[in-house]
Amino acid sequence: MSYQGRARKFLESASIDVGDMVLVEKPDVTYEGMVLDRADDADDRHIVLKLENGYNIGVEISDARIELLEKGSEPRIELPPVEAAEDPELPDVSIISTGGTVASIIDYRTGAVHPAFTADDLLRANPELLDIANIRGRAVFNILSENMKPEYWVETARAVYGEIKDGADGVVVAHGTDTMHYTSAALSFMLRTPVPVVFTGAQRSSDRPSSDASLNIQCSVRAATSEIAEVTVCMHATMDDLSCHLHRGVKVRKMHTSRRDTFRSMNALPLAEVTPDGIKILEENYRKRGSDELELSDRVEERVAFIKSYPGISPDIIKWHLDEGYRGIVIEGTGLGHCPDTLIPVIGEAHDMGVPVAMTSQCLNGRVNMNVYSTGRRLLQAGVIPCDDMLPEVAYVKMCWVLGQTDDPEMAREMMRENIAGEINERTSIAYFRG
């Protein structure tokens, strides 16, 4: 039981546990229902009941009396196995979970939440997958995506590598949406893959009528059977439940806090439009299935700073990172790739110390061009690495990966300027900007 403080004492005073049926009386209303657990960080002034009509309510306890009606057991989900024989005519797709909204199912009777990443769980929630591929599923870990770290990128890459090595024809990675584009970029650099690797998630949980989880999973499995052998992100194309877009893993970004079509290709077109029934190629320039040998380069350097330029930013911010031993810096600059000229001397110091400093743009659309204005030219003279049309988050991830491959500052500069996974376009088309 996760209840703490006053709420816990309130329940314990009547020998009540999670799962028990209770009567709660307040001065003007009486409730009967099952006691549900709460999050660890919830306040201690309320308890949660599941009423007979299926709704969950919070009850403030300061003026309440509680009575045990019937002992129960803590809500849990017990599901029968799924009878599904492998179809030798279908491809084999592995689905691995790192956590997030898409990675759970909910028991509407009890309110219990269950991590949903055995093959049985996936097929029970999405029986349509049986028409697309043979499915195997497992959880690598279960964390909120805001708690992702570079070490988890490595663990995810190794898990995907293992699935492909074991014969998977495609891999789907279920991930929380907040930092999915960081992890998709990381695996784009770490893996050379002969098969599709598709990231997906959900903006809205499966207990909501507007959930996007089912379509995203189905379309992702379909994409994992395609000929696009790259690391990609597959999420809703529009607010409607019609199709998903397949985005290159280094050219995608979460662009809205809550919309189901939050993920957008930036400085690029989506690679494909996907439905559970098929895939329509939108961009012909992609790595084809079987064109690369499987390869894993998973060393990363975590001591990389990601710094946003803003009016009044102090040079001490960069100096602090240098004093703390950071090995690389990525600046999210303004406009064409600028920052206040007060930063230029300390950026020059970083360059002289062998710490590469890369420049991206907060504009997201378009590309860095540091030859237009004097500030940009002075930054180039100080040793800044221009990142063309690379997204800021991708440049940060790439710097972590590059510095895991080399200690040589000049080699790091060359690698940052090299188009390794489709993160840099030779030119930026007006077709890429939606406005």
Swiss-Prot record:
Q: Which reaction does it catalyse?
A: L-glutamyl-tRNA(Gln) + L-glutamine + ATP + H2O = L-glutaminyl-tRNA(Gln) + L-glutamate + ADP + phosphate + H(+)
Tell me a GO biological process for this protein. amino acid metabolic process
Active site per UniProt: 101, 177, 178, 254
Record key words, sorted = ATP-binding, Ligase, Nucleotide-binding, Protein biosynthesis
SUPFAM superfamilies cross-referenced by the UniProt entry: GatD N-terminal domain-like (SSF141300), Glutaminase/Asparaginase (SSF53774)
Q: List the HAMAP family.
A: GatD
Q: Give the protein's recorded name.
A: Glutamyl-tRNA(Gln) amidotransferase subunit D
Organism per entry: Methanothermobacter thermautotrophicus (strain ATCC 29096 / DSM 1053 / JCM 10044 / NBRC 100330 / Delta H)
UniProt gene name: gatD
